[in-house]
Structures are given as C-alpha cells and as structure tokens.
Amino acid sequence: MTLLLAGDIGGTKTILRLVEVSNSSELHNIYEESYQSGDFPDLVPMVQQFLVKANIPSHPEKACFAIAGPVVNNTAKLTNLVWFLDTERLAQELSIPFISLINDFAAVGYGIFGLSKQDLFTLQAGKHQTEAPIAIIGAGTGLGQGFLIKQGNQYQVFPSEGGHADFAPRNELEFQLLKYLLDKHDIQRVSVERVVSGQGVVAIYQFLRDRKLAIESPEIAQVVRTWEQQAGQAEKTVDPGAAIGKAAVQGSDRLSEQTLQLFIDAYGAEAGNLALKLLPYGGLYIAGGIAPKVLPLIENSNFLLNFSQKGRMRPLLEEIPVHIILNPQVGLIGAALCAARL
C-alpha cells in the first residue's frame, strides 16, 4: 500500500485527505481535515499541521493538489490568496518526493473514475462506447469545461477555457438577455459563463426583473437587493444564486422559477455545443455545485431537448450518455487518483 496526500485547494476553503492506494488502484481514505485557506500564509504550514494531527506513522510518498486557478509550468497562484505554489519547493519543504499541481476542473476529470453508480444521476443513457472521448462541463462560481482522451491504457485529462466562448442566443428572450448584459456591463461580447454559472443565475434574475417579465417576491427581492448593495465588497453576507435556486426548487417564487428555466435551457444548449465538438460517447458528465441542488428542475426540464436540438446532428447527440455528478468531493477523489499515477 502507498500513502498519498490529496488536496482540494480553494481561495476560501482547503480540504486535505490522506489516502492509501493498493496495487489495484483502489483508494482507502485514512484521514481528512478542512481548513480556512486564509488562516495560513502558505500551503506548507497547513500540510505540516495536518500531518501532525493525522498522527500517521508513515509519511506520504506522493501528493496531488487540485488548484482553483491555472497551473503553469508546475506553478500556481491562487486568485484570492497570496500563496504561490511550486512543486519543486513543496516537494523539498514537505519531504514528499512526488508532487503534482492540477487545475481543479482537471481533478474532476480524474475523479470520474473513482465514482460509484450512487454518485451519478443519469439523464440520458445513450449508447456508451468503450475508449471513446469523455467530456465534462460544470457550472458553479464559473463554467468549467474539459475533456478526456484515451492514450494507451489510461485517459488523459485536458482542461479548457470553453466557458469563455461566446454566449449564443437561440430565441427572442435569449437575444434580449444578450442585449441586456451588453448594455449593463458596457462590453463588446458576452461569454457563456456570464449566463451559465452562479453569477449567471443572478444575471438572468435581474434581467427578468428589470424587464418586468415576472413579479418579485419580497423574500428573494431582499436577498438580491442586499447583494447588489454589497457590490465591490470582498465579503458578502448573502448568496442570491443559492436563494434563487432554492426558491425555484421549492416552487415558492415565480421569478426564480422562470430564472432557472432560462438558465437550464442555456446550460443544456452549451452542454450540447461541447458534445458536438468532441462526440463524447464515453459520456458527458455534468459537474459543479449547481446541478445537484436543482436536480428536480433539470430532470423535469427541457435540458436534454436543448442539449440535442442541433439540427441534423440531433441523432448523434441522442446517443451520448449524459450524467450529473452528485458527489461534491469528486475533485478530491481525482486529486488522489492523479497522485497514484505519479
């Protein structure tokens, strides 16, 4: 058995986990802790404190850290922290011979292979093809996209910046939304991430509200107004995207319901755009924090219709398996699996 250290490092919270891996690549969780990232000047003292508290007689041989941000030449700088991470320095200061830094969405790609059936909700069974490409898309704070290609006997994960591609409206309401965002932000283009993400949920709500296309409820209106008043502040006391999503699932706010309907339509369409580019008959996996929370709405929506509504290509997309990832720790699982490969 080999002892591994896996980490999911965010600007706010970091989760560290010790894992043992057998020759069959089966993972066994040993110890886990969560930390507030800002409480530490660097990752090294956090890991050192973690290992002392874990009180494990052996020392990790390999480590992989999933980073909320780009990784360039084995280095990473987190957006909301002063940390600058370098694999060579980390290996030396932590006495761990093999260390890797990967983008957090790449970690999701690796994590797919550590999920059980209970960790997935299948929207479309499709016709799975062994060794075919796999696609991942995930709306959360932003919109992540990536893909996996089989090379030899293993899949290699390739993150992308597809979430920053142009938002492509398909009907009059979406064209109005595009115009609204262009005017509001005084910009020349709108990325799909401005619509299909947590910030997109709020933007759609504001659009429908300002165009008086639905009536606000006092409860959600107060949350959104508070958030708008706190614009520019580092710390916000409310999460309007979460409040809107919850109200939509509960059916307690008509404007929130319409917001999620437009959001899910756009989400399905963008997932279909990604699928067209790759034809991922190995599966298209929907990650991110939003989909599991609004699963009842997605299940009973036109997500799949918008996913497959691509003209003459529709029959191809109807054969692609589509799954929603329910396990919020898929990135941590992926970091452990990535460490096992080192």
Swiss-Prot record:
GO terms for biological process: glycolytic process. ATP binds at G7, D8, I9, G10, G11, T12. CDD domains: ASKHA_NBD_GLK (cd24008). It is an enzyme of class 2 (transferase). InterPro entries: ATPase_NBD, Glucokinase. It is found in: Cytoplasm. The keyword Cytoplasm applies. Coiled coil: none annotated. GO terms for cellular component: cytoplasm. Keywords: ATP-binding, Cytoplasm, Glycolysis, Kinase, Nucleotide-binding, Transferase. Pfam families: Glucokinase. It catalyses: D-glucose + ATP = D-glucose 6-phosphate + ADP + H(+). Its main location: cytoplasm. Its EC number is 2.7.1.2. GO terms for molecular function: ATP binding; D-glucose binding; glucokinase activity. PANTHER family: GLUCOKINASE. Belongs to the bacterial glucokinase family. NCBIfam families: glk, PRK00292.1-2. This is Glucokinase. The gene is glk.
